[in-house]
Swiss-Prot record:
Residues 29-144 are extracellular. One of its GO terms (biological process) is cytochrome complex assembly. PANTHER family: CYTOCHROME C-TYPE BIOGENESIS PROTEIN CCME HOMOLOG, MITOCHONDRIAL. The gene is ccmE. It is found in: Cell membrane. It is a single-pass type II membrane protein. Belongs to the CcmE/CycJ family. One of its GO terms (cellular component) is plasma membrane. Heme chaperone required for the biogenesis of c-type cytochromes. Transiently binds heme delivered by CcmC and transfers the heme to apo-cytochromes in a process facilitated by CcmF and CcmH. The chain crosses the membrane at residues 8-28. The keyword rRNA processing does not apply. Keywords: Cell membrane, Cytochrome c-type biogenesis, Heme, Iron, Membrane, Metal-binding, Signal-anchor, Transmembrane, Transmembrane helix. This is Cytochrome c-type biogenesis protein CcmE.
Length: 144
């Protein structure tokens, strides 16, 4: 084989390896993306269908009910409420009236089945997107 053909073959092989690696990386990133929505968005039908997503808001006062490892509560943006079911150990800072971001899927009955629950870590912190979404939901709810 001529050196020119070897070089061309090496370039083609390198491009193929880079292309396959890029495809695998993009596929992995796409499967780990979880869109963020508010309870008002979910009620309005703006939640992604058939994929996991995140809901952020406040845990509604008086809604927390424990049944062994399964916990039922309501997440609210102070305009709309979504019932949530989670099986697992909740974070220590998870409390009623405090902010939370939950990841999971919506079942056909309208209950959010959480696979992960995150609680805000101090009384002053709220993720910027959660704060903005709560403000927007309150503004839209009071405008109606």
């Amino acid at each position: 084989m001529k050196p020119r053909h070897k070089r061309a073959l090496m370039i083609v092989a390198a491009l193929a390896v880079i292309g396959i690696a890029a495809l695998l990386i993009l596929n992995a990133l796409n499967s780990n993306i979880a869109l963020y929505v508010t309870p008002s968005d979910v009620v309005a039908g703006k939640a992604p269908q058939g994929q996991a997503f995140r809901i952020g808001g406040l845990v509604k006062e008086g809604s927390l009910k424990r049944d062994g490892l399964t916990v039922h509560f309501v997440i609210t943006d102070l305009v709309k409420d979504i019932p949530v079911s989670y099986t697992g150990i909740l974070p220590d800072l998870f409390k009623e009236g405090k902010g939370a971001v939950i990841q999971g899927n919506l079942n056909p009955q309208g209950e959010f089945i959480a696979s992960e629950v995150l609680a805000k870590h101090d009384e002053n912190y709220m993720p910027p997107e959660a704060k903005h979404a709560l403000e927007q939901a309150q503004k839209n709810g009071s405008a109606k």
